[in-house]
């Protein structure tokens, strides 16, 4: 699938305003898709449509914790040192999955990882499903679980 087809298919499940902070959406509207990486979007589509097959809600609050974050987001502004994350780079999202705990969702993704078009990371030990496609030097697993 090319990028346009991926976004068109994702529209069945998500609006871009759910995946980016309010600052980004208020400035760029539907063009906000441009800030989300194709590999992240493609994995998100496969996870939602083919693996989990259940509604996913992106954690989207005033602090923009689970979505693409920009320099205006409170969480970013409060940092006292250099701050880069997969969220800032348009390669991550935090979700809740209707009908599944985060651990159940992570387990299902690991079991069906052969369907994923790109390697990805998941955050373990948290009550939400964090997924990202931030490349990891020296990590060869298709699905890598990290804890911070």
Per-region residue spans from a language model:
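Short amphipathic alpha-helical segments, especially helix-boundary/capping motifs
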Residues: 17-23, 69, 80-83
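A generic short-segment signal for beta-strand/edge and adjacent turn/coil regions
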Residues: 25-27, 54-66, 96-102
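Catalytic cores and adjacent binding grooves of peptidoglycan-active enzymes
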Residues: 81-148
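Extended, low-complexity, intrinsically disordered C-terminal regulatory tails
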Residues: 41-80
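Active-site acidic/histidine clusters and adjacent loop/turn architecture
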Residues: 1-57
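Polar/charged alpha-helical tracts
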Residues: 4-8, 12, 74, 103-107
């Amino acid at each position: 699938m090319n990028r346009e087809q991926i976004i068109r298919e994702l529209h069945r499940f998500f609006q871009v305003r759910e995946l980016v902070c309010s600052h980004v959406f208020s400035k760029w509207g539907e063009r906000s898709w441009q800030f989300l990486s194709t590999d992240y979007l493609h994995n998100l589509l496969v996870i939602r449509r083919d693996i989990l097959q259940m509604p996913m809600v992106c954690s989207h609050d005033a602090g923009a914790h689970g979505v693409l974050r920009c320099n205006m987001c409170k969480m970013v502004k409060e940092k006292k040192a250099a701050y880069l994350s997969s969220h800032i780079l348009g390669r991550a999202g935090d979700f809740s999955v209707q009908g599944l705990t985060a651990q159940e969702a992570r387990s299902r993704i690991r079991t069906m990882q052969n369907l994923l078009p790109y390697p990805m990371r998941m955050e373990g030990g948290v009550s939400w499903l964090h997924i990202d496609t931030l490349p990891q030097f020296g990590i060869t697993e298709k699905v890598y679980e990290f804890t911070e």
